[in-house]
Amino acid sequence: MTKTLTKKISNKKHAAVVTYIMGGDGGLDNLEEQLLFLEKSGVSAIEIGIPFSDPVADGPIIQLAGLRALKKQVSLEAILNKLATSQVQIPLIIMSYINPIFHLGIPKFVEMVQKTPVKGLIIPDLPYEHQTLITPELEGTDIALIPLVSLTSPKERLKEIAKQAEGFIYAVTVNGTTGVRNKFDTHIDTHLAYLKSISPVPVLAGFGVSSIEHVEKFAHVCDGVIIGSKVVQMLHENKKAELGTFLQKAAEVRIEN
């Protein structure tokens, strides 16, 4: 069964644009407003980060957003309860470290997620080899477990991950944490083109994407981008009009590969 997320991300003409926000940054009461704003801006899907005290993959902007949310006592359960009443029509994706999911309980987590518009799950600190901790609970659901793929992964490992991939492949474009960047690894284009050649699902580039030029660059070699730190920072600074314009332009970028 092709997951809803894969169908929504697949677009042969325009780059898929997935945005990231930290759940509860600015207060849980603002979450629905943020989601509806991003949906109106033309994005394909929205990742919602779950605040965690030891966010190993997060750069400084997202770490600060997580701290702001934690100070407001925001939890995974509180976010899922809020999402259960969301009116958003595009797919949502939960990005959480494994600890908050364990704390809530995997069966309860999956049960709660199915009552929301969430169609994807990213767990950055859950290695591919340990996915069976959660995949039995996800079987038969419309929730895609999205793999994170690093630049340094050997080809055999990439093939194995691609074979099992759901939703889309999250191709990490840098060696390091999230954050706004000006430069990417010189081998990134070759890496993405190879991933696209072996993947049955769309391939999206993430970590460091922060300009229309970046979106255009990646539209030549993969199916779209994930934009995180820039979105988090602009929402925090209340630059919604500027952010909305940027995202609308990004969503109009044509795929050239």
UniProtKB/Swiss-Prot annotation:
Gene3D superfamilies the UniProt entry points to: Aldolase class I (3.20.20.70)
Function of the protein: The alpha subunit is responsible for the aldol cleavage of indoleglycerol phosphate to indole and glyceraldehyde 3-phosphate.
Domain of life per record: Bacteria
Record text on subunit structure and interactions: Tetramer of two alpha and two beta chains.
Native organism: Listeria welshimeri serovar 6b (strain ATCC 35897 / DSM 20650 / CCUG 15529 / CIP 8149 / NCTC 11857 / SLCC 5334 / V8)
Protein name, per record: Tryptophan synthase alpha chain
InterPro entries: Aldolase_TIM, RibuloseP-bd_barrel, Trp_synthase_alpha_AS, Trp_synthase_suA
HAMAP family named in the record: Trp_synth_alpha
Pathway membership, UniProt: Amino-acid biosynthesis; L-tryptophan biosynthesis; L-tryptophan from chorismate: step 5/5
Catalytic site: 47, 58
UniProt keyword terms in alphabetical order: Amino-acid biosynthesis, Aromatic amino acid biosynthesis, Lyase, Tryptophan biosynthesis
CDD domains attached to this UniProt entry: Tryptophan_synthase_alpha (cd04724)
Gene Ontology cellular component list: cytosol
Pfam families: Trp_syntA (PF00290)
EC number, UniProt record: 4.2.1.20
Family named by the database record: Belongs to the TrpA family.
SUPFAM superfamilies: Ribulose-phoshate binding barrel (SSF51366)
